[in-house]
Curated annotation (Swiss-Prot):
Belongs to the eukaryotic ribosomal protein eL43 family. GO terms for molecular function: structural constituent of ribosome; zinc ion binding. PANTHER family: 60S RIBOSOMAL PROTEIN L37A (PTHR48129), LARGE RIBOSOMAL SUBUNIT PROTEIN EL43 (PTHR48129:SF1). The keyword Metal-binding applies. Keywords: Metal-binding, Ribonucleoprotein, Ribosomal protein, Zinc, Zinc-finger. This is Large ribosomal subunit protein eL43. InterPro entries: Ribosomal_eL37/eL43, Ribosomal_eL43, Ribosomal_protein_eL43, Ribosomal_zn-bd. It holds the Pfam family Ribosomal_L37ae. It comes from Cryptochiton stelleri.
Amino acid sequence: MAKRTKKVGIVGKYGTRYGASLRKTVKKMEITQHSKYTCQFCGKDAMKRQAVGIWGCKSCRKVVAGGAWVYSTMAAVTVRSAVRRLREMKES
């Protein structure tokens, strides 16, 4: 099958509609949304988005809540580090 798009990639389906800057923004979101992520439980590159905020691993069948378009958000990273720091303070 021939390659259809060179620059536009996944947003080629929108054609010339909606403007270039909006298509670039949507392209970033759709690439992160459709890509596979590393599973925290089994370590394989098998975590895929099932629905908005629901991510499932194809390998170990774990289902976790995450971001709408990205598996791990910046807010989740901040909360995780704060919880880890509080846990370490409590133990010591």
